């Protein structure tokens, strides 16, 4: 596999092709539908925050009803993400949108920000719902169904502060030791992630710059229509021509605004999501390495008899099983994630290319129509001047 590219045209294995064919031939078995909508602002003496309505419709037997409606704030989504990472350390958990911290609580929650976050949270939950393992997570079910007080009570049942601190200390110690013999396939995976992170971050910067320049171009172009209208008032012989130019500029402005909307709603969010995915993947690799490092330390202790060796063989056996499960989970999820990534990025850029083609065709047709009308007008005037 070529690690220097994440092109969607990379060949797939025969087995994955067979699985894909089977999937396409089977009927849609989706049984969990989630919608995030109706953001609502809450202002207290301590904080200002937004809650979102989450409607869940399902035919699964483990749910007590077929439809649920709850409200959740961003912190609740963070809790869910943390619980999923805790339960499935080497699965690729979908990323949440960043929690922007801006001076002034009210200014932070403008309409564009709220709508962008709503879409990202909607995608986050639906990616979990579509995941073959995460979709059956008990905390995910509780997140979708429990009322606010029930969710708050459930959160308190988690590990205490000292337990979490102990886990953090062990994780840091494992990362400091490092992994001596990381399997080759995970070396390749890590190289892919590093290269992917570089490329997707570069694409993100370029996309943001293109949007910024497009916005500046649009703001300047908007001024030219009124200028030509004012100009026409002082040019009696060019009134119609100048007004037609103003009309062409106005139509091109509307086309530009539509293209900018497509860029901000279709391409930029996809690229940004995969920037966050690249950070998530690095975290997944670290967690996998921590599990292996823990096994390596036990094996080393047994080899050099650094501690009581009576219980070590049993501990090593359990850790070997844990490493194998972690590796298998990551390998399976990796292929699934990579296929989704290739499809998402390909679709985003294809849609953007089609949008650009339509935009330039529309602007070209606008000005060609104007030139044709002016040519016809000139011919009519010429024929009238002839004796």
UniProtKB/Swiss-Prot annotation:
Bilayer topology annotation: Peripheral membrane protein
Gene Ontology CC annotations of this record: early endosome; early endosome membrane; phagophore assembly site
PROSITE patterns associated with the record: PX
Chief location of this protein within or outside the cell: membrane
Domain PX residues, every copy: 30-151
GO biological process terms held by the UniProt record: autophagy of mitochondrion; endocytic recycling; piecemeal microautophagy of the nucleus; positive regulation of autophagosome assembly; protein transport; reticulophagy
Compartments, record wording: Early endosome membrane
Keyword terms, alphabetized: Endosome, Lipid-binding, Membrane, Protein transport, Transport
Domain spans labelled BAR: 178-387
Gene3D superfamilies associated with the record: Arfaptin homology (AH) domain/BAR domain, Phox-like domain
GO molecular function: phosphatidylinositol binding
Binding site for a 1,2-diacyl-sn-glycero-3-phospho-(1D-myo-inositol-3-phosphate): 73, 75, 103, 117
InterPro entries: AH/BAR_dom_sf, BAR_SNX7, PX_dom, PX_dom_sf, PX_SNX7
Record's subunit section: Heterodimer; heterodimerizes with SNX4.
Family note: Belongs to the sorting nexin family.
Function: Involved in the regulation of endocytosis and in several stages of intracellular trafficking. Together with SNX4, involved in autophagosome assembly by regulating trafficking and recycling of phospholipid scramblase ATG9A.
Xref: PANTHER family: SORTING NEXIN-4, SORTING NEXIN-7
Protein name: Sorting nexin-7
Organism whose genome encodes this protein: Macaca fascicularis (Crab-eating macaque)
């Amino acid at each position: 596999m070529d690690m220097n590219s994440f092109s969607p045209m990379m060949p797939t294995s025969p087995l994955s092709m067979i699985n894909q064919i089977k999937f396409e031939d089977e009927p849609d078995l989706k049984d969990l539908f989630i919608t995030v909508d109706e953001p609502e602002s809450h202002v207290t003496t301590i904080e200002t925050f937004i809650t979102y309505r989450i409607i869940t419709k399902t035919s699964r037997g483990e749910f007590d009803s077929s439809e649920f409606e709850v409200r959740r704030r961003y912190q609740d989504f963070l809790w869910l993400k943390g619980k999923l990472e805790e339960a499935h350390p080497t699965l690729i958990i979908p990323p949440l949108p960043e929690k922007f911290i801006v001076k002034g609580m009210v200014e932070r929650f403008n309409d564009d920000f709220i709508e962008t976050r709503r879409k990202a949270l909607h995608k986050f939950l639906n990616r979990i719902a579509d995941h073959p393992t995460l979709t059956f997570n008990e905390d995910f079910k509780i997140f979708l169904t429990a009322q606010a007080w029930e969710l708050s009570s459930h959160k308190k049942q988690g590990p205490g502060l000292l337990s979490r601190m102990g886990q953090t200390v062990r994780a840091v110690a494992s990362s400091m030791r490092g992994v001596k013999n990381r399997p080759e396939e995970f070396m390749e995976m890590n190289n892919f992630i590093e290269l992917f992170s570089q490329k997707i971050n570069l694409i993100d910067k370029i996309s943001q710059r293109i949007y910024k320049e497009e916005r500046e171009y649009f703001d300047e172009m908007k001024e030219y229509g009124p200028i030509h209208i004012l100009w026409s008032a002082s040019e009696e012989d060019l009134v119609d021509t100048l007004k037609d130019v103003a009309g062409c500029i106005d139509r091109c402005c509307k086309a530009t605004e539509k293209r900018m909307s497509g860029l901000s709603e279709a391409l930029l969010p996809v690229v940004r999501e995969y920037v966050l995915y690249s950070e998530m993947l690095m975290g997944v690799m670290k967690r996998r390495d921590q599990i292996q490092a823990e096994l390596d330390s036990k094996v080393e202790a047994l080899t050099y008899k650094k501690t009581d060796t009576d219980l070590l063989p049993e501990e090593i056996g359990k850790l070997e099983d844990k490493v194998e499960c972690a590796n298998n989970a990551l390998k399976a999820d990796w292929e699934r994630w990579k296929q989704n990534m290739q499809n998402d990025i390909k679709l985003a850029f294809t849609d953007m290319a089609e949008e650009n083609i339509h935009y330039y065709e529309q602007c070209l047709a606008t000005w060609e129509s104007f030139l044709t009308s002016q040519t016809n007008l000139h011919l009519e005037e010429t024929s009238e001047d002839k004796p």
